[in-house]
Amino acid sequence: MISLRHFTTFLLRSSRSVGLMLMLFLTCSLVSCDKLPRNGKLDGHWQLMELNGTSVRHEGTYWSFQLDLLQLKSLTHSPITEVQYSGGVVARFEHRGDSLILTKGYLMNRDYQQDILIDSTHQADLTAYGITEFPMRYRVLLLTDEELTLIADHHRLVFRKF
């Protein structure tokens, strides 16, 4: 039979182990929190379905939001630019309430490990994506788990969650 002293020692060691495991788990959880979704329903992949009242669903234009980065893709369009780049467009954005601001856009130049800021020196026409300038300010008219509608000046963009 086990003595009370041995049993008490066993319990103390076990509770220390459980406490250490719990502390390790909480530390790991807190450290990794900065990569969790922070844009609510906006995070994820969206397909542009309608641009200014015209259906563009078959053009395969996509906006993907994560953290503060927006990736733009199109199966049928490329940015119109004279800048040499390896492909792809990304933008930094801010989302607060019913406001979405695309603050800066970049042409991805992965061949040289440096993205190119879209500005007056390095211009790119992104109208096929629904973007006419940077910064680009949209009002979020509708945002659900399935649909997103943005308004900017005379532009209306309707997306579906993909």
Where are these regions (language model features)?
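Bacterial signal peptide processing site
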Residues: D34-L36
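Short, low-complexity, disordered segments immediately C-terminal to signal peptides
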Residues: R38-L48
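Short, exposed beta-strand-loop hairpins at the edges of beta-sheets
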Residues: R139-V158
